[in-house]
From Swiss-Prot:
SUBUNIT field: Heterotetramer of two alpha and two beta chains.
Family of this protein: Belongs to the ArgJ family.
Molecular function GO labels: glutamate N-acetyltransferase activity; L-glutamate N-acetyltransferase activity
EC number(s) reported in the record: 2.3.1.35, 2.3.1.1
Pathway: Amino-acid biosynthesis; L-arginine biosynthesis; L-ornithine and N-acetyl-L-glutamate from L-glutamate and N(2)-acetyl-L-ornithine (cyclic): step 1/1; Amino-acid biosynthesis; L-arginine biosynthesis; N(2)-acetyl-L-ornithine from L-glutamate: step 1/4
Name of the featured protein: Arginine biosynthesis bifunctional protein ArgJ
Organism: Staphylococcus epidermidis (strain ATCC 35984 / DSM 28319 / BCRC 17069 / CCUG 31568 / BM 3577 / RP62A)
Top-level EC class as recorded in UniProt: transferase
Cellular-component GO terms for this entry: cytoplasm
Residues of the signal peptide: none
Site residues by UniProt (Cleavage): A183, T184
């Protein structure tokens, strides 16, 4: 697998555009991804009981056909908790895209991110569509989907499948309200491989479980979380069948892109100064390891300790202890970076200057070994700073 420079339109047969429509004052806020041909599609959506209108519509469209040819996204207004009007507006958004591209409406996915409770202004939406072009600036799409993010999040890879080169690209947004169970967290992945919708859905489901579902910034799950994967078959490779060697290679591509995007989201948490990576090994089951890792990285006390550059392993073991899974508390090792701070649940003396150097870094690695099995899991998050409170206190309602 090769990591390459590119954007969401790097796979064969895809194009994209992003622009300023007027949902925000100045920044780019509207864009789309378009495939030359209908692509097979897979999706996972928020587990929040309050589901935004665009998600409902997109999910229903996917269930009808398993195909998608375009994804249109606005940022600044979430179109969530907007009642019947919100459903009409999401449908209108789908219709306008379909009419402009001359494709079936159910082949258009719609997504929105921003302030909850505001109705979609149709004049701004129509203005956006009047300026969108099929082969526009694909790099601008990554900018157009952002809200409180500080930078774009893109990853592109390719891999040889026999004599064919398959390319996969991913783009995401997310900075706050991040605690997906698949903030707003949106991710879109394009690929030119020949793979069925059913096989694609299984691959996405498996990989989401160990990537996007393992990040947390603030413990809030958005009403608009969505991950979509489109694969249009333009490479003309032999169809990737489930459980084949090619399927394993395809999943590795998906895993790399989604891990990279997940870590980028965690690193870009609102007000964050440090990325936290927690690895739990020696568990009886991978699900238990992931649960403990996410419990640790989601702890407000762990987050504030990391912000204060304090190697407070007591907060780490406490957060592990309230994860909803069993482990033997007397057998745990904890490492912060390369330094052991707890061995078999007994404190270890460490060099304060050495550990202070580790705590001052922009990326903090925490490892727990449960000594109960051979399974492991990871989770990612960020520290909790004064700026997080400031950003969200000032965010519009």
């Amino acid at each position: 697998m090769n990591i390459i420079k590119g954007n969401i339109a790097s796979p064969l047969g895809f194009s994209a555009d992003g622009l300023h429509a007027g949902f925000k004052k100045k920044k780019l806020d509207f864009g789309w991804i378009v495939s030359e041909v209908p692509a097979n599609v897979a999706g996972v959506f928020t587990t929040n009981k309050v589901i935004a209108a665009p998600l409902k519509l997109t999910k229903n469209s996917i269930e009808k056909s398993g195909k998608m040819q375009a994804i249109v996204v606005n940022s600044g207004i979430a179109n969530s908790c907007t009642g019947k009007q919100g459903e009409k507006d999401a449908f209108k958004m789908q219709q306008l895209a379909a009419n402009k591209l001359q494709i079936q409406p159910e082949y258009v996915g719609v997504a929105s991110t921003g302030v909850i409770g505001k109705v979609m202004p149709m004049s701004i939406l129509k203005n956006g569509f009047s300026k969108l072009v099929k082969n526009g600036n694909a790099d601008d799409f990554a900018k157009a989907i952002l809200t409180t993010d500080t930078h774009t999040k893109t990853c592109v890879v390719n891999e040889e499948f026999g004599s064919d080169t398959v390319t996969m690209a991913g783009v995401a947004k997310g900075s706050g309200m991040i605690h997906p169970n698949l903030a707003t967290m949106l991710a879109f992945i394009t690929c030119d491989a020949n793979i069925s919708s059913q096989t694609l859905q299984q691959a996405l489901k498996d990989v989401v479980e160990v990537t996007f579902n393992q990040i947390t910034v603030d413990g809030d799950t958005s009403t608009n979380d969505m991950v979509l994967v489109m694969s249009n078959g333009c490479t003309n490779n032999n169809e990737i069948k489930k459980d084949s060697e090619d399927y394993y290679k395809f999943k590795q591509m998906l895993l790399y892109i989604m891990t990279d995007l997940a870590k980028s989201i965690a690193r870009d948490g609102e007000g964050a100064s440090k990325l936290i990576e927690v690895t739990v090994k020696g568990a009886k089951e991978s699900s238990a390891a992931r649960m403990i890792a996410k419990s640790v990285v989601g702890s407000s006390l762990v987050k504030t300790a990391i912000f204060g550059e304090d190697p407070n392993w007591g907060r780490i073991i406490a957060a592990a202890g309230y994860a909803k899974t069993y482990f033997d508390i007397n057998q745990v090792d904890i490492f912060i970076g390369r330094i052991p701070v707890l061995i078999r649940s007994s404190p270890v003396k460490y060099d304060k200057e050495e550990i202070q150097e580790i705590m001052s870094a922009e990326e903090i690695s925490i490892q727990l070994d449960l000594h109960q099995g051979n399974c492991e899991g990871q989770a990612w998050g960020c520290d909790l700073s004064y700026d997080y409170v400031k950003i969200n206190a000032l965010y519009t309602t």
